[in-house]
């Protein structure tokens, strides 16, 4: 065994140990616990039972520990580690091709090393198709989760290289074939121009060619790429296999033919290395689009049987680095060369794109300043916009707020990786609009509340209001962090600016803009931002469709339909009640529940209901948002499908170092769109982000000022937040500042300070999130939504529809509902979309049962659906 140490200039190879026995053609994988060495052969005939872990002890000394051996001894096979398993498949068993595959849960339990019991290899379904000798193996993320990929190899029985790969999906316990290993010939023709002509094979012609992966090595790269280094030429290799077979087959030999074969063998073994056409190009496989490409060409990696080791890059160096060690430079001739390969994607934002983006940001800051004078001395203006917002603007504002960068980037990324199975959730927004308008909106408008949680105090008690408001604030801070992180990730990918600088800039600009002008600036900012982001999405969708393949829209449609990219519902007849995957009923239930939560208990949305002049206008705004969600979101799913079709027909255009799948859309913006248009779309990402963050910060400051600070400083309990001039049902209501016994200027000052603090805290959490590996931020967001806010929606459902439920039963039901989703998240495999639904159902059912023992004692005039038209109580409900 050899090791290398020291810096790049002083690195020296050192002999550090020897293996327990001399073996060749085994497999080794690197794990956090050390190097696992498996199988091999000592004589080229018999496969050996061999499995050891090589690691260092506390003193830094190398140690060898025995591991469970494979169920069958193997050589010339491939192994890989990832997602808690070591996989092994293919190869030979005592000279016989093997189609069996195995995996071992890793790391092993400590008891194994003490008792040699408690761990064993698990046999997987048999490999599909022919046997695979000398394949390459990698564990890499696919469209949904990680898979075990076994690519290439050859079947000695048919003397043919295997033309494709296969991958094992652990979620379905099944193998699936990849596309054929074919690529377009490098246009530069470097490869053929520097290689000696061969009388045995003809030169490649223009077009696609088949490639074999025999004698190659592979490593994962980024979020969804597999890089294949080296390997033999398919046609030369297959002719060599056939020649060897004929030399060993005595039934077809004649003296003349035998002499001819020996002459060909001599000629074959005595050529210069370039004649053999060992692969000089880096062959890249993309797991999502199932496509192959060659990305660069170098004679330094033209070896077969080399080891490829990823290395950690120093700060500021290449995005991906690997060492190509040893191998053969030609058949029978080993190489001691070591080549370092550095790969990086470099993006330049450009002055024109910066100009577009800066103009947009300055415009948003000016908008906040414009409304600052109108909101600075009036709490009614700051929190409700004075009731001056038109219904259509309120609807667009709700849409822009709920859209966010999560939709703008993650939905295209989700549709790009999978299909349209999440689209029915958008239809659920429109469906939920009708019960929200009929059953919920009247309470928020007629009670003249400033925050949604004031209703909970009137219906239950102040403890319920405070708890719900605090949880809302916690959730909004988490959401702020997430939607800060997403565009910062995009900007880092497309400009190279440090992600932490991006987060800080985004947060500070947004804090300045939203705390200056209050909710009116936020709403009109949402309108402008909504126009920008919708226009940008339509432009991107059209560009992707037109530029797919050679025939534009027809290729887009053909590829998308061939790969089932428009599928709306996932249904498995064998598992109709599958609650792990995003099946049709999981998406529908989750969409209805999560949207009901957002549109009935989310202060950022409910605050928009209160900015219009009357209840009818608010209802129109809600319907406007529902219709926009159904129609406009089609553009975002079309973008995702377009990204798939575009990059499947242009696989070499992908960034093989892209670490986050959610960055695919901004990467497309900067790598494919002309300057200026790319800046406009990046501005649209900023617009989606700022509309959401501004609403979050404004609603946090409202909830804190009204529900927390206002309660502490109140001299009289507020009946609502209307200003001196606004009336409700003919009765004047005091302003918020008057209601809590302080001036309006002081109230607005507290609200601004609360908004600044919330924004800074969200910024800090976003910086922490930048260090976490999250494959799908859309999934992550919906998980947080279900965990933190589901049972709050249950509280409003209890209050409005179940007059028998009192405060004690409601609180216990709330905690039971919250506990149920934490149990689902940490102890089951239930899909995150179900969390909100389960939380609502459990909280309401528990509260109903407990209401038998703790019924609501007092009547609730005007606070339940049954008594909506009754006169309101003169003061909020106290403690039970």
Kindly give the residue locations of the regions a language model identified.
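Glycine-biased, low-complexity coil/linker segments
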Residues: 3-4, 205-208, 720-721, 737-739, ...
């Amino acid at each position: 065994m050899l090791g290398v140490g020291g810096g790049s200039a002083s690195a020296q190879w050192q002999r550090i140990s020897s293996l327990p026995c001399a073996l060749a053609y085994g497999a080794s994988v690197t794990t956090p616990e050390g190097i696992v060495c498996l199988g091999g052969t000592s004589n080229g005939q018999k496969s050996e039972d061999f499995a050891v872990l090589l690691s260092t002890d506390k003193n830094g000394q190398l140690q060898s520990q025995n591991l469970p051996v494979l169920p069958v001894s193997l050589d010339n096979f491939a192994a890989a580690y990832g997602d808690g398993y070591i996989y092994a498949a293919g190869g030979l068993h005592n000279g016989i091709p093997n189609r069996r595959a195995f995996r071992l849960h890793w790391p092993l339990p400590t008891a194994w090393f003490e008792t040699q019991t408690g761990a064993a290899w698990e046999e997987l379904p048999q490999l599909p198709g022919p046997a695979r000798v000398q394949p390459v193996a990698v564990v890499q993320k696919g469209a949904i989760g990680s898979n075990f990929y076994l690519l290439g190899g050859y079947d000695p029985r048919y003397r043919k290289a295997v033309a494709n790969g296969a991958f094992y999906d652990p979620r379905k316990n099944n193998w699936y074939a990849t596309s054929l290993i074919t690529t377009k010939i490098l246009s530069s023709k470097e490869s053929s121009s520097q290689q000696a002509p061969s009388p045995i094979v003809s030169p490649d012609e223009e077009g696609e060619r088949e490639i074999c992966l025999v004698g190659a090595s592979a490593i994962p790269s980024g979020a969804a790429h597999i890089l294949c280094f080296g390997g033999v030429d398919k046609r030369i290799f297959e002719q060599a296999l056939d020649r060897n077979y004929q030399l060993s087959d005595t039934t077809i030999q004649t003296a003349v033919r035998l002499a001819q074969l020996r002459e060909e063998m001599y000629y074959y073994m005595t050529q210069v290395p370039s004649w053999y056409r060992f692969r000089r190009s880096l062959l890249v496989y993309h797991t999502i689009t199932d496509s192959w490409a060659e990305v660069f060409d170098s004679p330094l990696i033209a070896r077969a049987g080399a080891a490829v080791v990823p290395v950690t890059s120093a700060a500021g160096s290449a995005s991906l680095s690997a060492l190509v060690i040893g191998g053969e430079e030609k058949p029978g001739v080993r190489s001691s060369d070591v080549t370092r390969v550095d790969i990086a994607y470099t993006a330049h934002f450009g002055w024109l794109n910066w100009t577009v983006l800066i103009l947009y940001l300055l415009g948003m800051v000016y908008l906040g300043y414009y409304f600052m004078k109108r909101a600075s001395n009036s709490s009614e203006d700051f929190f409700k916009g004075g009731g001056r917002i038109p219904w259509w603007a309120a609807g667009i504002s709700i849409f822009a707020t709920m859209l966010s960068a999560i939709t703008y980037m993650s939905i295209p990324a989700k549709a790009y990786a999978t299909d349209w199975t999440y689209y029915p959730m958008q239809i659920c927004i429109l469906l939920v609009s009708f019960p929200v308008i009929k059953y919920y909106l009247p309470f928020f408008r007629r009670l003249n509340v400033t925050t949604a949680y004031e209703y909970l105090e009137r219906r239950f008690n102040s403890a319920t209001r405070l708890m719900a408001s605090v949880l809302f604030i916690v959730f909004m801070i988490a959401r702020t962090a997430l939607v800060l992180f997403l565009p910062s990730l995009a900007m880092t990918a497309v400009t190279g600016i440090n992600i932490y600088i991006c987060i800080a800039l985004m947060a500070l600009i947004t804090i300045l803009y939203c705390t200056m002008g209050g909710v009116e600036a936020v709403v009109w900012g949402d309108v402008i931002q909504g126009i920008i982001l919708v226009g940008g999405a339509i432009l991107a969708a059209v560009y992707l469709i037109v530029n797919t393949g050679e025939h534009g829209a027809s290729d887009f449609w053909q590829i998308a339909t061939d790969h089932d990219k428009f599928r709306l519902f996932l249904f498995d007849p064998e598992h109709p009640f599958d609650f792990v995957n995003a099946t049709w009923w999981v998406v529908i239930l989750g969409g209805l529940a999560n949207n009901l939560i957002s549109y009935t208990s989310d202060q950022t949305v409910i605050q928009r209901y209160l900015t219009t002049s009357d209840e009818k206008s608010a209802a129109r705004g809600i319907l406007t948002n529902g219709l926009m969600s159904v129609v406009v979101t089609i553009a975002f799913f079309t973008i995702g499908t377009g990204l798939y079709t575009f990059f499947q027909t242009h696989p070499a255009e992908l960034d093989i170092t892209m670490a986050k799948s959610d960055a695919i859309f901004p990467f497309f913006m900067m790598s494919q769109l002309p300057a200026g248009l790319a800046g406009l779309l990046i501005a649209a990402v900023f617009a989606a982000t700022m509309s959401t963050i501004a609403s979050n910060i404004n609603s946090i400051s409202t909830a804190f000022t009204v529900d927390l600070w206002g309660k502490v400083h109140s001299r009289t309990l507020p009946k609502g937040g209307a200003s001196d001039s606004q009336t409700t049902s003919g009765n004047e209501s005091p302003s918020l500042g008057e209601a809590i016994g302080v001036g309006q200027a002081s109230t607005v000052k507290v609200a601004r300070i609360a908004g600044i603090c919330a924004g800074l805290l969200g910024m800090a959490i976003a910086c922490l999130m930048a260090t976490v590996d999250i494959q799908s931020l859309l999934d992550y967001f919906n998980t947080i939504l279900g965990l933190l806010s589901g049972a709050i929606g249950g509280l409003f459902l209890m209050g409005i529809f179940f007059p028998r439920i009192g405060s004690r039963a409601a609180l216990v039901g709330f905690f039971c509902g919250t506990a149920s989703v934490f149990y689902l998240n940490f102890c089951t495999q239930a899909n995150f979309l179900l969390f909100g639904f389960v939380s609502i159902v459990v909280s309401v059912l528990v509260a109903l049962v407990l209401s038998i023992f703790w019924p609501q004692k007092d009547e609730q005039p005007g606070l339940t659906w049954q008594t909506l038209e009754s006169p309101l109580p003169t003061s909020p409900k106290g403690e039970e």
